[in-house]
Amino acid sequence: MARIAGVNIPTNKRVVIALQYIHGIGPRFAQEITKKVGIPVGRRVCELSDAEVLQIREAIDQGYKVEGDLRREVAVNVKRLMDLGCYRGLRHRRSLPVRGQRTHTNARTRKGPAKAIAGKKK
């Protein structure tokens, strides 16, 4: 199992798919990285040499924010919004949807399980 950016990536999958196991690397960035390093599309992780794994590591370290750094940056951005007291910050603080979705009937993922209200039965 190859270890890239602190993540054990699966050995039996193709490189483009396996790279997507790293937080912050999606399909587009995975393709970009493999193209930059010069790895064919169909190559599997178990077929990679140590030099190729090292090249992938260097390409990721060089140009992409992944894993802990990315999570930290997102958390800092959300905290900044909350400290500013802007509308988006207030929505984050109250654990409500931030991007204008309706909350009267939906938004259960963000709000959590429904709370029972005494005397409210139809």
From Swiss-Prot:
Q: Which InterPro entries match?
A: Rbsml_uS13_C (IPR027437), Ribosomal_uS13 (IPR001892), Ribosomal_uS13-like_H2TH (IPR010979), Ribosomal_uS13_bac-type (IPR019980), Ribosomal_uS13_CS (IPR018269)
Task: List the GO biological process terms.
Answer: translation
Instruction: Give GO cellular component annotations, separated by semicolons.
Output: cytosol; small ribosomal subunit
Task: State the UniProt keywords alphabetically.
Answer: Ribonucleoprotein, Ribosomal protein, RNA-binding, rRNA-binding, tRNA-binding
Q: Which family does the entry's similarity section mention?
A: Belongs to the universal ribosomal protein uS13 family.
Q: Could you tell me which species this protein originates from?
A: Bartonella quintana (strain Toulouse) (Rochalimaea quintana)
Summarizing the function annotation, the protein's role is: Located at the top of the head of the 30S subunit, it contacts several helices of the 16S rRNA. In the 70S ribosome it contacts the 23S rRNA (bridge B1a) and protein L5 of the 50S subunit (bridge B1b), connecting the 2 subunits; these bridges are implicated in subunit movement. Contacts the tRNAs in the A and P-sites.
Q: How does it assemble?
A: Part of the 30S ribosomal subunit. Forms a loose heterodimer with protein S19. Forms two bridges to the 50S subunit in the 70S ribosome.
Which Gene3D superfamilies would you find in this protein's record?
A: 1.10.8.50, 30s ribosomal protein s13, domain 2
Question: Which NCBIfam families does the UniProt record give?
Answer: uS13_bact (TIGR03631)
Q: Which GO terms describe its molecular function?
A: rRNA binding; structural constituent of ribosome; tRNA binding
What's the protein here called? Small ribosomal subunit protein uS13
Annotated region Disordered: the residues are: 97-122
Q: Name one Pfam family in it.
A: Ribosomal_S13
